[in-house]
Amino acid sequence: WLFHPERPFWQVPEAKIGTEYTASKLNGELSESSNKLRLFSSYAGEGKEGLTYAQAARWLLSVNGYDDTSAKPKGKDLPSVGAGWLGKLGYIQAQGNNLFETLMLNLTLLQDGVKLWGENQPCWELDEPHSAERTEIALPDNPAQLLTLQSRRLLLNREGETVTGFSLLGGDFFPRENAFAEQMTVWRDPDAKKSKKIGQVTFVPSRHDPAKQFWREFPSVFCEEGESVRKPGVVRWVEMLQNDPDCPLERKRLIRFAISGMKYGDKDFFVNDSFSDSLTFQAALLGELGRRWTVPIRDEIGRCERAAQYVGRLAWELSLAAGDKNDTTAESARTQFYFTIDQPFRLWLQSIDPETDKLDEKADEWQEKARKLAAELGRQMVERAGNAAFVGHRVEVKTGGKKDEKKTVLYTAPKAYNSFLYDLRKLYPKKEGGTA
């Protein structure tokens, strides 16, 4: 079926006129273009020049979903299709304990948990397969059509038993605005001010930031929906399952949500890297019992963001005190702070039992942990700052006035550290009987 003369699997014969690529571009572990080789490649020599049929079939699906925008159209005045549909998403899926559970958790029998789907029609059941280049279609109204969307027209090339490359044209696409048939993406309002002004919100898929831990996205994925927040369809579906008394999804069962995506270069012209992350917590957090927990969790994540800013400011002031003006100092310190609290926060979130735990006690538990971790990181930063930072340096800074007036400020390590501890204690007040 991979090389059927009329209907090859996930391909169209008409794609033979498209842009030609080698097997190293098809191989998702390389995604290597002809004019830009990977420096540290997992394949070399003949291993880069060809793929087995099994490998090619797998990567065929990958390039269809995640292809970049480097291919040139063959026709004139054709619209831009952008990256492959999956590459445009902030992809998210629920994961069970085995393949069957994973399939069932992601098989949203109702669109967004409330709306019936249309009749399923995968691309291979069409009377006439789509073959025209860069074709705008209506938003699919059934999951089969969406899951088999041909973002690219593809045709494999082979020599004997080896796939040596492929030809590619732009395929089907539809506007991403309010494309709510897509159940496995995070959403965002790209212009909240305009939406508020006209009283109408437009949502688009929100790509994940590979530099940002998934738990930091918790408010936009799992919290209550509002004017500018819309939950992914698969999250709504699992919520519905959790609230159904006849559903076998036990409250205390741990459920995992995983995200993945591609990091593209300028204008999605090439793939820089791929990434993935996951988050585990009790299924009850998505049910009625968990509603009262989402706001406290969101608040703690917000406090983490502010603590990161305090750590970054401490690093910046320490660098000024030492006579250094490295612009990356603050960002590096914030990254280090998030790395420090990453696993502790995941474990705290996973430990929450909405049925038996008390909100205040769990919040206090995390705040004490976060305060200790931030304070220890700050102490280490001060120790590494050196003697010059303890003596300090005078630095000219702008006063913020209209005439760009400046004043001289003395930055020292003790002064910066005391200010940091003051802010930290305000953010995480020490509870009676607590330590640190």
Q: Residue ranges of each PLM-predicted region?
A:
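Extended alpha-helical scaffolding segments
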Residues: 1-35, 62-436
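Cys/His-coordinated zinc-binding microdomains
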Residues: 53-56
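The −1 position to Zn-ligating cysteines in a subset of zinc-ribbon hairpins
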Residues: 48-51, 153
